[in-house]
Swiss-Prot record:
Keyword terms, alphabetized: Coiled coil, Methyltransferase, Nucleus, Ribosome biogenesis, rRNA processing, S-adenosyl-L-methionine, Transferase
EC number assigned by the record: 2.1.1.-
One Pfam family linked to the record: FtsJ
Function recorded in the entry: Required for proper assembly of pre-ribosomal particles during the biogenesis of the 60S ribosomal subunit.
GO biological process, one term: maturation of LSU-rRNA from tricistronic rRNA transcript (SSU-rRNA, 5.8S rRNA, LSU-rRNA)
Assembly information from the UniProt record: Component of the nucleolar and nucleoplasmic pre-60S ribosomal particle.
InterPro entries: RNA_methyltr_RlmE, RNA_MeTrfase_FtsJ_dom, rRNA-MeTfrase_E, rRNA_MeTfrase_SPB1-like_C, rRNA_MeTfrase_Spb1_DUF3381, SAM-dependent_MTases_sf, SPB1-like
Species annotation: Candida glabrata (strain ATCC 2001 / BCRC 20586 / JCM 3761 / NBRC 0622 / NRRL Y-65 / CBS 138) (Yeast)
Protein name, per record: AdoMet-dependent rRNA methyltransferase SPB1
Gene name in the database record: SPB1
Keyword Ion transport annotated: no
Reactions catalysed according to its record: a ribonucleotide in rRNA + S-adenosyl-L-methionine = a 2'-O-methylribonucleotide in rRNA + S-adenosyl-L-homocysteine + H(+)
Broad class of the protein's primary localization: nucleus
SUPFAM superfamilies tied to this protein: S-adenosyl-L-methionine-dependent methyltransferases (SSF53335)
Amino acid sequence: MGKTQKKNSKGRLDRYYYLAKEKGYRARSSFKIIQINEKFGHFLEKSKVVIDLCAAPGSWCQVASKLCPVNSLIIGVDIVPMKPMPNVITFQSDITTEDCRSRLRGYMKTWKADTVLHDGAPNVGLGWAQDAFTQSHLTLQALKLAVENLVVNGTFVTKIFRSKDYNKLIWVFQQLFEKVEATKPPASRNVSAEIFVVCKGFKAPKKLDPRLLDPKEVFEELPDGPQNMEAKIYNPEKKVRKRQGYEEGDHLLYHECSVLDFVKSEDPITVLGEMNKFTVEQDDPEWKILKRLKQTTNEFMACIEDLKVLGKKDFKMLLKWRKASRDILGLDKDEDKGDIEIEPLNEEEQIEKELRDLQEKQKQKQKREKRRKNEEKQKELTRMQMNMLTPTDIGIEAANIGRDSLFNLKTAEKTGILDKLAKGKKRVIFTEDEIAQDNDLHIDENIVIRDRHDMNEVDDLEGELNAMYQDYKNRKAERDANFRAKQARGGDVEDEWTGFEGTKDSEDENNEPKDYIESDDSELSDEDDDEAINQLISKLKSQNNGSKLSSQAKALFSNPLFENVQPILQSKTDDVVDSESVGDATKISNKRSYNEMKKEDLSDSSDEDSSSESDFEIVANDESDGDIDSDYDSDEERKRTTKEKYDKDIDIATVEAMTLAHQLALGQRSKHDLVDEGFNRYAFRDTENLPEWFLEEEKQHSKVNRPITKEAVMALKEKMKALNARPIKKVAEARARKKMRAVKRLEKIKKKAGLINDDSDKSEKDKAEEIAKLMRKVTKKQKTKPKVTLVVAHGKNKGLSGRPKGIKGKYKMVDGVLKNEQRALKRIAKKHHKKKK
């Protein structure tokens, strides 16, 4: 017979066994506590007092003496004797006895343990159920000893075995510790049923319920509750087979009963779940009555033959049939109850009843308020977690205005809802004669007055369309990079800007709406409300009399910085703006404003009609004044500066612009022709008060289609080709850095060559050789490794010994899988910028 191979004590002689021998530990279990300590925050390094229960042979004590601080107290106890260890106190005792407790107190005196370790297991071999209970009982005794000696926020590490008492022990741990985690370190064998539980943050309760540490209470087996038959009826397809044997006194799997018993039973769900079949007694008079029911169909008779194959729909049909049967048989009729006489309450009882009702209502109100606040806090937490940091105080304050106090205009202004109130409906309506009498206006009777409500609806609709279009643009900009680039190049088309402030007369004629409705807040007598009303009226007037600016321009110039700025002159042109006229207008306005400033500064001047020349004769010019006039001493210099400025900004980027440039350069067109082309059907297009989405859509159709030439297209292509041929910024920077390094190396060599040349002790031949040696270092090319050719070993190369045909240089025989792996490794190394060794 052949010799059998030794199994190494069922696999116990693994790598941790040999590592323990190399490190000098007494058992391989030392690596378990090392791995647990590293995983859970190095608690041994912070422990000055450590108790090791069931410590034999002492490997955990060895690890503790190595990792704990110097002069730490380490105590090891076991029922079997142990060899002594340095810096460790060991004694022999049973941890379940009082002798062990007294000896521990004698060694520790007034100290408390920072960490308690337990890696014990009882003697097994009686029976599986007995062994599992004994192991859990030993763990509970170790916990009892740890609770007596642990410090607050201490740590308890114990070994526990998988059994039906595992969850009970975990529940006990959770009552005594802040954090309980189960782990299985790599040093623990997979075939072993052991699990290590790390309990951190000992609560150290002042009064401890003795039932938590009583094995009879902790491991008590509770009777099973009633079987859930509803799951069988309403989810018959989800059947979980539990192989737990027969019930007490019931040794059959097949059960049947009469269908009348099912009708008369108080718990029909249980009957449907337990029975396999309903039998029918044809001679029973009650069945003869139920047989004539319209629900008693052939399908019903087929269903009661085998209840275990029915589905949810069939069970519902049986329950409906039972309800109809009970109605016919009169089983659901309520028994006649006698009239209950209610004694009238006296005055004291009535008062007490009302007080109880009021208290109950108050409690309900407080409960609702508390629930509302909790919901708001929860929403706020969720909003903060999702990084939705938009302030919501305005909405909350506005929601609480009508709840806690009366309406107040001052409060409305503080909360920021004054604008919304200004746009709301008014109640007091005045006639046209009253408005004309107050404002000294003449109103034509033939004017058709539109309904204010309809106008508000139209305004709201336009606002919604504009908001939706803006959202559409934002979403498109997020998705499409070309659209973002187009917006950045062209920008948004703004309305025409006529200055910082418009003339009052034109504003009154053009922008003042005919409002025939006024507010009913005139009866308010409070000073704060009067002040707020005046502010509201002035704000509305400023909004109605605003200049023709876009929303962005209004937001910019509403800054207090622009309050004292005077309006400038600006001529309205459509396509072509004459730079000379703009420059003249700017020059005139600057000089005029400067003269006015000089007039205000002259306090001793009595003649108000004096010209600007007299002002200059009276007041001496400063250096800054001379700078103002010297900026535009020469019109030619100003024109040249303006031309240079605009020449820098011009970029011919379209075919139309290139065609126009060619025509201007060849003399085919003149400046006068360009001015004439500026007057076309689209030049005076009325875009005022039109929505942005409409203008964007019409923009592509509201322009002149200019002809292009083949030469312009080719010239633009050559220009773009030259631009595309340029390297990217990173490549250009890399080349520049490389060139700079080469220049620096050359400068160093020049300095060294100069030093060598100045050395008088060397001959000219030696100098030339050393300089040539330096130059060779600079011009030396880096050696490149020869490329290895990969040859796939299949077909004619399969099993080939020697060099394959047609392969020169170094080669490597690989199969298909290895080739793919090598390529993948190269891709990974290239991706992470690592050199493969």
